[in-house]
A protein has these predicted regions:
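Conserved catalytic SET/PR domain of SAM-dependent protein methyltransferases, capturing the structural core
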Residues: 2-178
Length: 178
């Protein structure tokens, strides 16, 4: 499935350029979700986050423009309810999944994440202090029974599991060439 995003989301602004703007010249906060979502306060905005390609050039991630202390509710999340596992979905319960190709679908995986998703309240929480410019990470096994696609983990944390799976599926690692 191909997901197209508006050009304003694909841009990869550097944190330095965002912080160097004088306050009076900064544009009003814009939601990272399309206008058709008509969301109120508490949802992710361009004032607090940006979506950009990872430093290694692989994949997109959500990065912060400001600090979030441990225990802070970072934001509310939104999306469409679907009944199949696909890229950018997060499992709510059973066969119900939240499809969010604008924000939560771009949270990066870490075996030692800095956020926690409360899928009952649709809230994202900081479980560690998060600095400006840092990628938001979650443990994909914390929400998913079965992943859309398993993959090797490169998070580098001391407790790295090396292979990312859902919490209820066996690892299907490719055979090692001899």
């Amino acid at each position: 499935m191909t997901v197209t995003r508006s050009p304003r989301r694909m841009a990869s602004p550097s944190l330095a350029s965002v912080q160097s703007l004088p306050f009076s010249s900064q544009p009003a906060s814009r939601s990272l979700y399309p206008d058709s979502f008509q969301l109120g306060e508490g949802y992710p905005t361009e004032e607090d986050f940006f979506v950009a390609r990872q430093e290694d050039g692989k994949g997109l991630g959500v990065y912060t423009k400001r600090a979030f202390p441990r225990g802070y509710r970072i934001c509310l999340i939104s999306g469409m309810i679907v009944h199949e596992v696909m890229q950018h979905t997060l499992q709510i319960a059973g066969t119900s999944h939240l499809y969010d190709p604008y924000f939560t679908g771009y949270l990066l995986h870490s075996c030692d994440p800095n956020t926690f998703l409360d899928m009952q309240r649709f809230e994202l929480w900081a479980v560690k202090d998060i600095a400006p410019g840092e990628a938001l990470t979650m443990d994909y096994a914390s929400t998913e029974d079965v992943l859309f696609k398993q993959f090797p983990c490169l998070c580098g944390s001391p407790n790295c599991r090396k292979w990312i799976t859902g919490r209820r599926e066996p690892a299907r690692m490719p055979p090692v060439a001899e």
